Amino acid sequence: MSRKCLVITVSGLAGSGTTTLCRNLSRYYGFKHIYAGLIFRQMAKEMGMSLQQFQEYAEMHPEIDREVDRRQIEAAEDCNVVIEGRLAGWMVKEADLKVWLEAPIQVRAQRVARREGISIEEAFMQIAEREMQNRKRYLNLYGIDINDRSIYDLVINTFKWGPDGVFAIVKAAIDHLYPDGDAGSGANPGNKS
């Protein structure tokens, strides 16, 4: 498939830094940012459920996941987009760059606690429960093992590198794809003519 623009997927578990990276990429390159987690949260709100309740509801209603995935795949048809979601790398098969971010669960729990205004212990328990539910659901629904990182072009430990380091690594990869500095301008990295 010949593409005249860049499509990047950024995936990772809760608190790994996916939103921070996507916002930085969006600001720097002017990419449109599609966030699967926000879609999921909006759907929970529309149904009057907490995120945890909606997570449990989604386990029994596969149409929820399929709708989120449909929106991600649809978004990948746009030019110059960064798509954020745990399964984005799996769903957007022809992405130009697939990134997985990770960090130790203790670090992720601290980040989530700070973001959500809850205790670290509560965040840790929520993350552990959510990851167990998601892994089971993704295996049952799609046959995808969320722990399989083999499809990703980059796997980055955000605890080790921090937001600036992570951005620099991904920027270097994008600049390699677009050596003439044309990322976001609609140029095709494989076509030098």
From Swiss-Prot:
GO biological processes: pyrimidine nucleotide metabolic process
EC numbers: 2.7.4.25
Binding site for ATP: 12-20
Domain of life: Archaea
Annotated Gene3D superfamilies: P-loop containing nucleotide triphosphate hydrolases
Disulfide bonds: none
Annotated catalysed reactions: CMP + ATP = CDP + ADP; dCMP + ATP = dCDP + ADP
Single GO term (MF): ATP binding
Family: Belongs to the cytidylate kinase family. Type 2 subfamily.
UniProt cross-references to HAMAP family, sorted A to Z: Cytidyl_kinase_type2
Protein name: Cytidylate kinase
Species: Thermococcus sibiricus (strain DSM 12597 / MM 739)
Gene (name only): cmk
